[in-house]
Structure formats: structure tokens, C-alpha cells
Amino acid sequence: MRAVRIQTGSLIVGAGYPEPDAETGVGVVRVLRVLITETDLGVARGIIPHTGVLGQAFVGVVERVVGPDPRALTGRTVVASPDLPEPTSDLARRGMGAHDPARAVLGVGGRDGCLAELVAVPTGALVAVPPGVDPDRAVFALPLARALHAAQIVRIPGKPYVTVLGDNLRALLAAQVLARLNASVRLLGTMPDRLDRCARWGVKHRHRDEAGRWGDQDVIIDSERSAESFELACGMARPRGTIVLLGETPHARQRSACDLAPVIERELSVVGARCGSLGEGVELLRSGTLDLDGLITRRFRLDDAKEALRAASDPSSIAIVVDADR
């Protein structure tokens, strides 16, 4: 089959890769759309160790399920969690399988991902997509689940003041989700087209260079996760406020000199947000309350995946999608 993979340290695109050899309890999915993620970029650059197929965020149709299929997934359109823990592990039993250090992860560490014509995923990680949600929306299920998780981590009574730092895809999704959850939200970014998009959504927005540091925000969602953005977040948060670091990928662990004095002085809480309920993300997609139109900056055929990865590295891109069925 055609696949985008790392072999002997090189990125290869094309046919000749073996189809998945699925075991009992695994669904073989024909991939329709793949959303290029930061993790994919880290793998392609050699920052994240991997041998095999890239790709984590996708939507596809289940061709077959090996063994019993009690959920009748065969023929259904699905999305999948990239985190694949052993269901009987201690953390999985406690509902935290995505944090199991022994878990497999799609597209990382030797586990074949979804940037191919077919991908094999345990049925427990598959989530059916409702008939009314088309693939171009369903492909956002994973980043949307993460944005929703970031919003749910911090629960403040009333109408909290929330600032979202950044204007990347996860920031734009988080701003919409938080506004829907009755927060007073503003997004601070630098790109005029992203700020214009917020205006159409009814989300408050400003250029980040124009924002003051009044120390009055209940929650700061930092989607950039840099030393500079963290310093800005500390200056905006109220005493005993919360900073949520919204991310997805191990290769973001760059060492940076962050001044932690404000965290101590102002008694700030700093929380990481990486995982999320894919089912809740799909349900939010089904509701149709989020505006996802125009978030796909460019789309590519599977054979043009190298160009897609380059495009995804461009800060002017919001979301890059590969049509794996072309």
C-alpha cells in the first residue's frame, strides 16, 4: 500500500509498504483524511524517534474488524485516539490510559500511524462519527478534544475572564470552546487573518503587543508554550489564577529559562493539557456549534505528503490535511 514512513532514518513516500497485519480486537481502517500534527513534524525532522508510518489524527472507514465486532464498527466512519494503552494497565483502569508510560502511540516509537491508505487500530480506541458529520469536520476531532479538555481542566464559578495566547489551530479551537462554555474570552495573537476570524466568531481579540499586564485574568490558555508566552501569561494572571499549557507532543520539551518567581509570588497554578475525550470532541462536532469553515489552509494528495509536511511547518498555515484516498 501507499504510505508515508521513516525507513533507515529517511522519509519515504510511496507504494510498497505492507498492509497492516491486524490481531483480534483490531479494526483495519481505510483512511480518508489526515490532519498533519506537530508530532508528525517532529517525527519527520528526526526529533521524535520513530520507524514506520507517520500520522496521528485521521478519519476513515472501518474495512474489517478481526474477531468479534460487538459495536458493529465495520463500515462505519471513525476517528481514533493516538494513545493505545493496554486496557488492563493500572492507569487505564483508572481512566488515565493516555498517561500510561508503556502505552503505544500511533505514528511514534515504531507504531505505524495513519498517514497511509490503511491503518490498524484497537477497536477500543475507535470512536464512530455520526452520519451528519463530514470527513472535513471529523478530521478535527482530536485537536478539538484537546481544546475541550483544556477548558474543562479549570472550573471557575460564574463567568471567568480567560485569555488565550496564540493564534494557531489549538488556540482558535480553544477560544471557540471556552466562549461556548460561558467564559469571557479574548484571544491574543499576531496574525491579522486569525484576529479577523475571531471577530466573525464574536470572540474578543487583540494583537498581543497591545495587551496590558493587569494581573486580572482568571485563566490563561498558553498554546505557544515558550518562555516568552509563559512570562506574558504570568503577568496577566490574577493572584491564585491558573495557567494552562496546551500542547500535544514530546518534541515541545525544549529547555527554556522560565522565570518562576511570579508563580511563587502570585501563588499561580500551572497545569498541562494534552489529552482529551475523543467521544466528547465528536459530540461537539455533531452539535454543529463550532465554526470550522476555512480552517483547512491547504490539502494535498497522499503522494504529495512531503509538500504537506513543509506546508504544515509554515506559521501562516492553520491546518494542513492530506486526502489519503487520493
Q: Model-found features: residue ranges?
A:
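NAD(P)H dinucleotide-binding glycine-rich loop of Rossmann-like/cofactor-binding domains
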Residues: 84-165
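Glycine-rich beta-strand-centered segment in the early N-terminal region that forms part
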Residues: 20-34, 44-93, 130-132
